[in-house]
C-alpha cells in the first residue's frame, strides 16, 4: 500500500485526504497546516498525522494543544507521493522542494499548466501522466467541462464549443471574498482561462469561454453551446451523459431547478460535507438545433475534482494503466454515481 502526503489541509486537501483514506491501495502519510486552527484539530481527531508547513510556527501548535509529527519535509520522508493542495501559486513554489526530495507530486488547478508541465483529467488524458513525476489536476470548472464534453466528443465529434461560465463569488467558508451585490465579468476580457485550460487535457478542442462572478457560494453554473461534427438527436446526448459516470442528469421538473436545490439533494445523499462529486446536467436544457447542442450544468467547486486527484496518484505511480479501472475503483470507494 502506497503512502500519500497531503500538503495543505484546506477546502481541497481535507477532501483529498478522506478520499485517499477510503481507498484500499493507498493511505494517508500525513497532512500539513500553516496554523493551529479547527481544521488542524479535526485532522488529529480523524487520526491523520499532522505536520507544520512553516517550521517557525511549530510552537503555536504546542501552545494550542495540537500535537504535530514534524515539518512538511519530515512528512515527505514518510510518503511515496505528495498531493499539493496549497493555495494558488504556492504549489509551483513547492515544486523545487519536491524535486530535491525526489518525490512525485500532484498539483491543483490553481497552478499554471506551464509551471508544472503536464495537466490531468481521468477521462481525457490519463495515459499522458502514466509514470510522470509531476502533473496538475485541472480546475473544478475545467473538470466539469471535460466530464461532459469528452463523452459528447466521443459520440459525435465536436467542431466548436462556446461556454458561459457563471462562477460562484466565494466558497461558503470565505468571508472576505465576494461580490455581495454585483455581477462581475471575471475576466472582462474574452476568452477566459477556462478554454485554454481545457485544451491542456482535450488536445485540439476548439473552445472559447467567457466568465463572470455572481453573489452565491454554492456552485458554479455553465451554459454550453456545441457545434457537432455528426448529426445526433437530443435523446442520444441524454443517453450518453446518463451512462457516463461522474455525470448525472437532473430534472427541474423534480424540484432540482436551481443550484440550491441540487445542493439540498447532495445533502440527502448523506456524504461527508454534502459533497457532490458528479457534474449535474439539467436534462430539460439538452437540445439540438440545426446541428448545435445546448445544455446547462452545475459544478460543486469544493469537491468535483477530488476523485481525479486519486486517479492521478494511480497514474503517476503506475498502480493502474487502465483509466476506467482506476475511475471505477475510486468511485466504489467514494460512493460516486
UniProtKB/Swiss-Prot annotation:
Catalytic reaction list: D-glyceraldehyde 3-phosphate + phosphate + NADP(+) = (2R)-3-phospho-glyceroyl phosphate + NADPH + H(+); D-glyceraldehyde 3-phosphate + phosphate + NAD(+) = (2R)-3-phospho-glyceroyl phosphate + NADH + H(+)
GO BP: glycolytic process; lysine biosynthetic process via diaminopimelate
Binding residues annotated for NAD(+), in chain numbering: 11-12, 110, 168, 301
Enzyme Commission code(s) on record: 1.2.1.59
Binding site for D-glyceraldehyde 3-phosphate: 139-141, 194-195
A GO cellular component entry from the record: cytoplasm
Chief subcellular location: cytoplasm
Keywords: Cytoplasm, Glycolysis, NAD, NADP, Oxidoreductase
Subcellular location(s) per record: Cytoplasm
CDD domains according to UniProt: GAPDH_II_C, GAPDH_II_N
Pathway: Carbohydrate degradation; glycolysis; pyruvate from D-glyceraldehyde 3-phosphate: step 1/5
Gene Ontology molecular-function annotations: 4-hydroxy-tetrahydrodipicolinate reductase; glyceraldehyde-3-phosphate dehydrogenase (NAD+) (phosphorylating) activity; glyceraldehyde-3-phosphate dehydrogenase (NADP+) (phosphorylating) activity; NAD binding; NADP binding
Active site: 140
SMART domains reported for this sequence: Gp_dh_N (SM00846)
HAMAP family: G3P_dehdrog_arch
Subunit relationships: Homotetramer.
Family the entry assigns: Belongs to the glyceraldehyde-3-phosphate dehydrogenase family.
NCBIfam families found in the cross-reference section: GAPDH-II_archae, PRK04207.1
Record protein name field: Glyceraldehyde-3-phosphate dehydrogenase
Species: Methanothermobacter thermautotrophicus (strain ATCC 29096 / DSM 1053 / JCM 10044 / NBRC 100330 / Delta H) (Methanobacterium thermoautotrophicum)
Amino acid at each position: 500500500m502506497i503512502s500519500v502526503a497531503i500538503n495543505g489541509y484546506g477546502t481541497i486537501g481535507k477532501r483529498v485526504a478522506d478520499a485517499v483514506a477510503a481507498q484500499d491501495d493507498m493511505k494517508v502519510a500525513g497532512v500539513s497546516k500553516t496554523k493551529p486552527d479547527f481544521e488542524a484539530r479535526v485532522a488529529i481527531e480523524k487520526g491523520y498525522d499532522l505536520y507544520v508547513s512553516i517550521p517557525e510556527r511549530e510552537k503555536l501548535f504546542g501552545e494550542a494543544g495540537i500535537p504535530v509529527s514534524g515539518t512538511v519535509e519530515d512528512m515527505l520522508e514518510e510518503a511515496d507521493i505528495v498531493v499539493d493542495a496549497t493555495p494558488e501559486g504556492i504549489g509551483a513554489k513547492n515544486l523545487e522542494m519536491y524535486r530535491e526530495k525526489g518525490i512525485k507530486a500532484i498539483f491543483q488547478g490553481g497552478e499554471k499548466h506551464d509551471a508544472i508541465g503536464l495537466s490531468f483529467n481521468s477521462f481525457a488524458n490519463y495515459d499522458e501522466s502514466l509514470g510522470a513525476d509531476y502533473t496538475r489536476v485541472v480546475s473544478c470548472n475545467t473538470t466539469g467541462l471535460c466530464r461532459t464534453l469528452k463523452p459528447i466528443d466521443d459520440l459525435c465529434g465536436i467542431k466548436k464549443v462556446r461556454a458561459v461560465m457563471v462562477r460562484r463569488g466565494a466558497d461558503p467558508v470565505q468571508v472576505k471574498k465576494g461580490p455581495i451585490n454585483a455581477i462581475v465579468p471575471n475576466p472582462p476580457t474574452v476568452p477566459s482561462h477556462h478554454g485554454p485550460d481545457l485544451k491542456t487535457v482535450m488536445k485540439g478542442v476548439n473552445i472559447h469561454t467567457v466568465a463572470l462572478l455572481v453573489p452565491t457560494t454554492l456552485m458554479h453554473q455553465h451554459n454550453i453551446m456545441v457545434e457537432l461534427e455528426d448529426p445526433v438527436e437530443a435523446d442520444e446526448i441524454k443517453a450518453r451523459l446518463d451512462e457516463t459516470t461522474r455525470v448525472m442528469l437532473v430534472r427541474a421538473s423534480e424540484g432540482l431547478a436551481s443550484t440550491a436545490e441540487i445542493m439540498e439533494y447532495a445533502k440527502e445523499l448523506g456524504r461527508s460535507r454534502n459533497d457532490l462529486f458528479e457534474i449535474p446536467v439539467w436534462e430539460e436544457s439538452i437540445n439540438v438545433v440545426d446541428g448545435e447542442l445546448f445544455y446547462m450544468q452545475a459544478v460543486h467547486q469544493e469537491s468535483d475534482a477530488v476523485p481525479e486527484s486519486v486517479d492521478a496518484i494511480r497514474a503517476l505511480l503506475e498502480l493502474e494503466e487502465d483509466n476506467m479501472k482506476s475511475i471505477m475503483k475510486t468511485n466504489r470507494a467514494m460512493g460516486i454515481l
